[in-house]
A protein has these predicted regions:
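Short, conserved alpha-helix that lines the donor NDP-sugar binding/gating region
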Residues: 155, 159
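Conserved "HGTGT" condensation-loop signature of ketosynthase/thiolase-family condensing enzymes
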Residues: 1-140, 160-163
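Short conserved active-site loop signatures built around small residues
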Residues: 151
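Short loop-beta-helix segment that forms the pyridoxal 5′-phosphate
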Residues: 140-146
Length: 165
């Protein structure tokens, strides 16, 4: 263990409380609205190279790409080499929306209509892989899938790796 400090240099948030750090904070401080709490008015295409790439990503991955984009904008230019830069993401379940959609397609239209992208879209580690590839990071790419504690676990695991080097 070294005395190396871990610092957070950028944040990105896509949440039912708000998209972006300022909107998120305002949403946390405000009284919750009645009814469903969902992410609305979210256009994933602005965070992807093209609309097709966005469509071939589950909403979980779309949120991760958007949050990473926001965090990278705040961070600015990275000083670390890409082979030492990694991605640690925590998710409660990953691409469940894609799985649900494709089960409905299977039941209504048959197996030939199920998307060939089902498995790569629904994997919990799809978000981590997408962020790593988007930014060319070649270091560790770890996904933690531990329900509500996943984000905290991802931060702890990344912090441990940084301080162990």
């Amino acid at each position: 263990m070294t005395n190396r400090k871990v610092v957070v240099t950028g944040l990105g948030v896509v949440s039912s409380c708000g998209i972006g750090t300022e909107s998120f904070w305002e949403g946390l401080c405000a009284s919750p609205s009645a009814g469903d709490r969902r992410v609305e008015n979210f256009d994933p295409t602005i965070y992807f190279e093209n609309a097709k790439e966005a469509r071939r990503s589950d909403r979980c991955t779309q949120f991760a790409i958007a949050a990473a984009h926001m965090a990278m904008e705040q961070t600015g230019e990275l000083a670390a080499e890409t082979d030492r830069s990694g991605v640690f993401i925590g998710t409660g379940i990953g691409g469940i929306e894609t799985l649900e959609e494709q089960i409905n397609i299977l039941l209504e239209k048959g197996s030939r209509r199920v998307s060939p992208f089902l498995v790569p879209m629904m994997m919990p580690n799809a978000a981590t892989a997408a962020v790593s590839m988007k930014y060319g990071f070649q270091g560790p790419a770890e996904n933690t899938c531990t329900a509500c504690a996943a984000g905290t676990h991802a931060i702890i695991n990344a912090s441990r790796l940084i301080t162990s080097d």
